[in-house]
Amino acid sequence: MAQNYTFTGSLTMTASSTTGYSASMSGSTTLNITGVDQIASGRIDCATGSDATIMAAPGVGRILYVKNMDDTSTLEIYEGASSDNDLIGVLKPNEFLFTIIRGTGTTTARGTSNAVTAEYFAVEIDSAA
């Protein structure tokens, strides 16, 4: 049965120089999501040469967060059931991707040179989101 959720996210970044100068930026957002049938979260090992499913095909689209937990290797994120589909992100070590995708393809990931652990969170959205 579909559920309704409120998603609240915030991000703060600070850059500091060796001379003592610093700059900060922050932002936040709240999104009410109705009719959610699918939520996926956790960590998954993404090997080279094979595709790991982050989220099965949703009805309309999804909110997606993926972080490359590896210290040395790159992670590729695809919109589709395999890496033969559209590439939507290339994450260097410790980088993350946060986006909304309006599409019904499965989200997959693959390590490029070594097996990579990905941390992920995906929520299906409806047409009103």
Identify the residue ranges that each predicted region occupies.
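Surface-exposed ligand/attachment interfaces on beta-rich extracellular proteins
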Residues: 16-33, 45-59, 82-83, 113-114
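Short, solvent-exposed loop/turn segments enriched in Ser/Thr/Gly
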Residues: 56-62, 100-105
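An anionic, turn-rich surface loop/hairpin at beta-sheet edges
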Residues: 81-99
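Short, surface-exposed beta-strand/strand-loop-strand elements in extracellular ectodomains
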Residues: 58-61, 67-86
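C-terminal interaction-tip segments
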Residues: 2-17, 112-129
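Noncatalytic modules at the cell exterior or secretory-pathway interfaces
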Residues: 100-116
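Interface-prone segments of viral and bacterial extracellular assemblies
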Residues: 2, 32-43
